[in-house]
Regions:
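Catalytic core of the metallo-beta-lactamase
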Residues: 1-6, 12, 16-21, 116-124
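Short beta->alpha connector loops
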Residues: 8-11, 65-67
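Hydrophobic alpha-helical bundles that form the membrane domains of multi-pass transporters
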Residues: 64-72, 120-123
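Short acidic-hydrophobic, aromatic-tinged amphipathic segments that line or gate anion-handling sites
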Residues: 106-117
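Divalent metal-coordination and catalytic microenvironments
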Residues: 3, 19, 29, 64-65
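Pre-active-site segment of Zn-dependent metallo-hydrolases
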Residues: 11-14, 22-62, 74-75, 79, ...
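A generic "binding-loop/recognition-motif" signal
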Residues: 66, 88, 114
Length: 124
């Protein structure tokens, strides 16, 4: 397994970690840096597949509903599955009208429950 910390190791906020195994990848979080002046595509890490055209990116797991963990989802393909805890998905749907731009809580993806294993490709 390869682990690539794109952002969040030497800063608070903007978390984004990529896991790769057997040629398949998932991201844990895709957050907006706390020092970002606005939510802009310029903060999107250079990760293959965020345009939805690389099938090796299986999805993005969001750890919790803080903007520094999910804030850049507005700049990726809506075809990428997004994993949330059920409460986080409800919170983000409720918050969507107050988010900048035309941000909508992602519908594509899966829910996960605390302490219940789930599989995404080679990841458990």
């Amino acid at each position: 397994m390869k682990i690539n910390i794109h952002r969040g190791a030497k800063e608070i906020g903007g978390s984004c970690v990529e896991l790769e195994s057997q040629g398949q990848r998932i991201l844990i979080d895709l957050g907006l840096p706390l020092d970002a002046e606005k939510n802009d595509v310029i903060y999107l890490p250079d990760i293959p597949g965020l345009d939805g055209k690389d099938p090796s990116l299986l999805g993005i797991l969001i750890s919790h509903p803080h903007v520094d963990h999910f804030g850049l989802l507005a700049h990726i393909s809506p075809d990428i599955p997004i994993g949330f805890g059920p409460a986080a998905r409800r919170i983000l749907k409720a918050a969507a009208p107050f988010m900048p731009g035309k941000w909508q809580a992602p519908e594509n993806g899966w829910n996960y429950e605390s302490e219940i294993p789930f599989e995404i490709g080679p990841f458990t």
